Amino acid sequence: MSQSKDTRRSNRPGWDEYFMQVADVVSRRSTCIRRNVGAVIVKDKRILATGYNGAPSGLAHCADVGCLREELGIPSGERHEICRGLHAEQNAIIQAAKYGIAIEGSTIYCTVEPCSLCTKMLINSKIVRIVYKEPYPDDLARRLLAESKVTVEHFVVPDIN
C-alpha cells in the first residue's frame, strides 16, 4: 500500500536539512584521522561548491602518512599551521574560485562550526549565512562573526519520531 500524500510530505526534508545532509555525505570523503568535516556552499537553493577536510590535491593523505598534530598530542583547534590538511570550508571556497563561481551572498552549510581561520575567509568571501551542526569551541571565531554581518545558525537535526 502506498503512503498518503500527506505522509510523504511530512518526511520531506526542509532546505536546511537537505543541504546539511549533503554536507554530511561530503564529510565522508575526508582523509583526516581526527575529524571528518564537510561544507556545502549554496545560493538560491543551488549547490555552488563543496569541500571536505584533507591534504592538498595530489599529496599523500593524513590517513596514509599520519598526523603530526596527533603525534605531538596537540589539542584540536591549536597549531593549525603544522597540519598538512585544508579545512572543508577552505576547500569549498577554493573549488568555487578554481571554477570561477561567485559565492558572494551565499550560505555555507558546515558539519562543524568554522574555526577562526575559516571564519575570516568566509567573512571576506561575503558569505552571508553560516549554518553548522556540531559546535566548535573557538571564541575568536564567534567574536569575529558577532562583529560581522554574517548570520550564524546552529542546525539541530530534527526529531523524526
Question: What do these predicted ranges mean?
Answer:
Residues 1-161:
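Zinc-dependent deaminase catalytic domain
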